[in-house]
Amino acid sequence: MPRRNDISKILIIGSGPIVIGQSAEFDYSGAQACKALKAEGYEVVLANSNPATIMTDPEMADRTYIEPLTPEFLEEIIRIEAAMMPAGAGKFALLPTVGGQTALNLAVDLADSGVLDKYSVILIGAQLGAIKKAEDRLLFKDAMAKIGLDVPRSALINNLKDGLEFSGKIGFPLVLRPSFTLGGSGGGIAYNREELMDLLGKGLDLSPVHEVLLEESVLGWKEYELELMRDLADNVIVICSIENFDPMGVHTGDSITVAPAQTLSDREYQIMRDAAIKVIREIGVETGGSNIQFATNPENGRMIVIEMNPRVSRSSALASKATGFPIAKIAARLAVGYTLDEITNDITRKTPACFEPTLDYVVVKIPKWQFEKFPGADASLGPQMKSVGEAMAIGRTFKEALMKGIRSLETGKSIASEKVEERIITKRLVTAHPERLQYVRHALLHGWSVEKVHSLTKIDPWFLYQLKEIAQAHAHTEQHTMDEVGPDELRDLKRMGFSDERLAHLWKAKNGKGASRLVYEKRHASGIRPVYKRVDTCAAEFESFTPYLYSTYEEEDEAAPTDKKKVIILGSGPNRIGQGIEFDYCCCHAAFALRDDGYETIMVNCNPETVSTDYDTSDRLYFEPLTYEDVMEIYEHEASGGAPIGVIVQFGGQTPLNLALPLKASGVPVIGTSPESIDLAEDRKRFNKLLEELDIPQPPGSTATSLEEAVANANKIGYPVLVRPSYVLGGRAMMICYEQEEVERYMRQAVEYSQERPVLIDHFLEEATEVDVDCLSDGEDCVIGGIMQHIEEAGIHSGDSSCVLPSVDLSEQVLKTIREYTFKLARALKVIGLMNVQYAIQREKVYVIEVNPRASRTVPYVSKATGVPMAKIAARLMTGRKLREFLPQNIEQGADLATGNCYYVKSPVFPWGKFPGVDTVLGPEMKSTGEVMGVADNFGEAFAKAQLAAGQKLPTKGTVFISLNKRDKQHAAALAKKFVDLGFKIVATHGTADEMEDGGIEVERVFKVKEGRPNVVDLIKGDRIQMIINTPQGAEPWFDEKAIRRAAITARIPTITTLSAARAAVEGIAALQRGKTTVYALQELHRERRQGMPGQQVNGLR
């Protein structure tokens, strides 16, 4: 069937901020859909609240709304867009299948509330009936029964009484799955009545439709997924089979997964394939991709259907990257009427999309967790997803892919080789948790049988035998020295996936250049080097036109280097807190810009969720770990073509930055800011000296390499002090210490340090305003992109603070000083590309906190606010072009990039709901997973919109509970008065209430948790409180504070932990009380700015 000509405009709903359970994979799928539909000539409108995405770039859609993803805001966008359509235009369609669960839920809300009918909007990609049939647990169960497929025995529960009754019939354990939630939120396994009551209560609260599916436990069964596509002509193909290494009971997002499935016989696979095709047809997904999950009982082969996603999912992104088949792009084209046989495969340019992909390699995905960021969080894994990112690796065998995947995670952790107590290993094997794979390896290394490990873990014996072979190779290698190992044995170890670093560790090799370099040189001397194979969807049956490559130790190379001038861009690896999608955004922009400038762009990354690992983002994609060995091999392979080559390290965050000096030492041309300058900014003593020479103030500070030195220096500097390790991103292991005892505890427990990696100790500036500055520099000229004022005070990690552009109340003198210091620093550090500077302003004095001569996480946000693609310009500066080519007027006038008449507020999004035991207080260690942006012509409204987009809806009436620490109590009355003036009642604990009453404020007193009843937690649970302002007492949260903040999360009450954010909330609430808010299309804002501000013409940029 040809494309639909009856449609003229298509609205795509994005997935919003990065959260656990819904990550960068939806930027990848949304961006593909936008490009595909624009190329087909449709008018594309995008709604998404996340400024850090490629899909929200103004060129990806005709109009882009960075607005809160709520039914109210979407209705306003639909109203405006419908009104803009000329008479006689085609239909207005909504595509809800590329924005994850968020978009699907919103589409259902808009349909059920009548909004779609009101504005004559049609759904494409998935019809309402199909969405409901797949998402509603009861309808899905009935549909499976109709086609004769088995499902777990289950019941849909709306109250505690029915839940207990069902448990009496079926017995424990029971699996709980709340309806319409994300990443298994609220899910769990109940082993007894008490756990059932607790989990069921929480699950009912979290489900938007107040329902939870209780089902029989299939713990320990094998789990599989099939990724399918269907078109309007009822052609159905299976793109990829995926097998979970971990058995049922662990959320698939927290499980190691393998593609294609390894332990199914051909007959079993065909039965599962036929069942999946029956499912997609019965549910009624007319077009696009679907993911169907199965479980099989290893004892008797019983197969059951677990669930189906009638949309592009996390597994779709993995299947896309595993096969090279662009699922989201093809799903978008199917949604507008094409059939699979009418779409050509971009990779082969010969085969149609109805050819099922064939794999002649193995793909392994391993999740990345960060429980160390959340002390007190339960690290066991279950039906609720907890990982923050993932790495993917490709090899010719499972063993090779697994070993490459493990080193792609960059954990740097390994269990010691010496024996661990048997009872500890047993405990670690029985319960799924992030380090279980290491304990499995450890058990096998120390003689445990595969049968024993299988009985404890229920991991399939086939996988365990593979791990046993790795363990045996490990043990054998450890018994020899490097000189005793011949070329054949070394080649076998490399084929198994052992890295040079791992081999050097096993051989205890020592060398001045570094042990792994010694192994590298031994390999090369024996001619043992990787070759590069192509991911081509057809197992090399047809020629591939998109070089999507992976390394292996075989004979034939499929990726001869070209003779074009080229740039290698090092990506950021798996998403993690502190190094997320913002850095991938910068890598993509570098690839787009340099490709336009005639360079062959080469991307190196191992993250399957991202746009950077899409087959058409760069000219060549190496899906490889970001380690010295892997990058060096790629560089030498590409350089052998003889063409000019450069390597960019400053866009991918800390991961590639850590490689800058070793690469340069090996003769690799690192372009942009030199590795020496990067190192100078990171080296505390040398950087302090530079600031003194430039006459730029900094908080008093020093370094320490021992506990005694740390205590002496902290006492000398004066408390409070900020302590942190050197060379980290995301505020890893940072702490504000208010007394000597806290410094001692930090040095003993929190951090590893050495002569090379000292601990940094700075005086902490209390009641200071923090400011972030992003700028562009070519080594001579410098232009500031944005001076962002933090809404949280200094001491809260910059990634966890809301910030506003332009600044709200910084004086002209402070702004002038910031510009002067920024220009001085850019010149002194010889920055070529991007630089980020963090300042603290205390009583009008400007201090430098730190300088990062690289891309920062705020670059996408500043680019969206100003309309200037900073990362694209930075990439071009690194290849030798000058800033005057792009921003001549800004240089002449000394002007920052302009933001027009609007305020842009960026707010963080936190995973507190996934870690209910964790305190929500903010500090110098970053804990947010994503971000949103609010845009308005006044600060209050922009802040309110950002808070709403982040899931923290500010109330417009009701009662505010205020409890302030000793330092903040003096401001209690003034703050309370602002809320009283807005019509709120005030509740406070006795100490804060005294201050308020002294200031003439009427206040209701309430007990602290340990003082009596009813206390503040009782009021929260009784829905008496609409907002909480609770500033922490010190480094260690008091029992009362934690209880309050935890109760607030459960009740989903907005909670603010700093005075400055409370003041911003007052402005936000006032704006909401004034009435209707406005929505803005990014393209219109940028057009108005360029017309109204001649000082910002961006030359020569697409």
From Swiss-Prot:
Gene3D superfamilies: 3.40.50.20, ATP-grasp fold, A domain, ATP-grasp fold, B domain, Carbamoyl-phosphate synthetase, large subunit oligomerisation domain, Methylglyoxal synthase-like domain. It catalyses: hydrogencarbonate + L-glutamine + 2 ATP + H2O = carbamoyl phosphate + L-glutamate + 2 ADP + phosphate + 2 H(+). Residues 141-336, 688-879 form the ATP-grasp domain. Residues 952-1102 are annotated as: Allosteric domain. Mn(2+) 1 binds at residues 293, 307. Mn(2+) 4 binds at residues 850, 852. This is Carbamoyl phosphate synthase large chain. It comes from Koribacter versatilis (strain Ellin345).
